[in-house]
Amino acid sequence: KSSAASDVYKRQAYVIAKDIIHLLLTLQDLIKDDPEVAPYMKLVMVENYNVSAAEKLFPACDISEQISLASKEASGTGNMKFMLNGAVTLGTMDGANVEISELVGEDNIYIFGESSEKVIEHYEKADYCSRDIYENDKRIKECVDFIVSEKMLALGHKENLERLHHELVSKDWFMTLLDFNDYVEKKDQALADYADRKTWAKKMLVNIAKAGFFSSDRTIEQYNNCLLYTSDAADD
């Protein structure tokens, strides 16, 4: 209390994250109030996400979207839990998605986006410009501009929506626009494949069967043999 150096000041770290949540809640209201769309689509923001909520979501999921920018995800376990419950992954080559892809094969996963190496190269060269993509891609421009459209502004807060729009066009640190078109194409492919129930069931079974690789027994054994110590060292 007596040290001025320990004072904590307000920072901007989570402003964009809150703007994204605000965008989702605004879209939620927009979809809910549209009589032509509401019967076919629903957006739900799960608040206070915890284990109890996860126990309902994991078994119910058909497509697990793990869409972090390649090189940004260390390795979560959510995708493994979805996989064990039969969900098919749609994601980037990042985190445990890399191992899932190797296990199930390209026919049983939907991979999109730039590689980690390419993304890191963009950061090193500082040559990524979201505005160039925005101004030269009609579909991307239309989608980004929808954030600040009359329909959205009528339901949401102008400050939040305009700030998020500006972030995507002027900075886009996580290179959202870079992978956008590839994501849309893979999502469309996944939804089309989902319509073939027999083929989709096979994809689900492959994912369930291959999920055993992520068991704690196998993981602990590997840590023991490769990272912590070997049996020979233990004997010594």
Give names to the regions the model predicted.
Residues 1-5, 9, 229-236:
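Single conserved hydrophobic/aromatic residue that forms the stacking wall/gate
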Residues 3-44:
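Conserved catalytic-core segment of nucleotide-activated headgroup transferases in glycan assembly
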Residues 25, 51-52, 76-77:
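Residue-level marker for well-ordered alpha-helical positions
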Residues 29-33, 63, 70:
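Conserved helix-loop functional segments at active or binding sites
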Residues 42-44, 66-69:
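Short, flexible loop segments at the rims of nucleotide/cofactor-binding pockets, characterized by
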Residues 43-52:
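Catalytic cores of eukaryotic secretory-pathway lumenal/extracellular enzymes that build
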Residues 52-60:
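Short acidic alpha-helix that forms the nucleotide-activated donor recognition element
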Residues 59-60, 67-204, 208-213, 218, ...:
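Catalytic binding pocket for nucleotide-activated donors in carbohydrate/polymer assembly enzymes
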